[in-house]
């Protein structure tokens, strides 16, 4: 099975792209979504988060995401700490998820493939890019945060231009109408590359 990483900066439109791959029948694992679930359900992970960020980071057994975001997105050390707790749990979950799969290829959506230097774990990488202003607006609308918070979140990640050379496919997410065609082209290309080998 070919493992394809799908990545891109916050607000680039990775979920939109993933949904088009799903429509083509591609098995997609969304690491960020699974991480959110695990932070509310994995007792070992919950304990580690509480030990690192305080018991009051959970209210009625639910993670106070807004409070956690205000801590980690303005502090790289705290963000790195959170990632060091969450990523092993997500990786273990992904390994379990893959057991028994018969898919020709699977996409694992991971926002920070390059930031965590895990690009070598993937056979192919798809990078989703979008203009900074579009990303800022998406983050503000989605996360109900202010403009500066959105900019800080973007600045906590490696610039997209630095990811281009190590990516096999680039999707410029400027006009949503173009996305299905771009996704289909990449899908066919991946399938063809598998047939060749």
Regions inferred by a protein language model and the residue ranges of each:
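Walker A (P-loop) phosphate-binding motif
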Residues: 1-33
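A general structural signal for well-ordered alpha-helical segments in protein cores
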Residues: 3, 18, 35, 46, ...
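Residue-level signal for inorganic ion chemistry
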Residues: 13, 32, 82, 107, ...
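Short, structured coil segments at secondary-structure junctions
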Residues: 24, 53, 121-122, 166
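Well-ordered beta-strand positions
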Residues: 27, 33, 124, 168-169
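ATP-dependent small-molecule kinase phosphotransfer cores
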Residues: 33-102
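ATP-dependent NMP and nucleoside kinases share a basic, alpha-helical "lid"
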Residues: 92-100, 105-138
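Small-molecule kinase domains that catalyze NTP-dependent phosphoryl transfer to phosphate-bearing small molecules
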Residues: 94, 102, 120-121, 132, ...
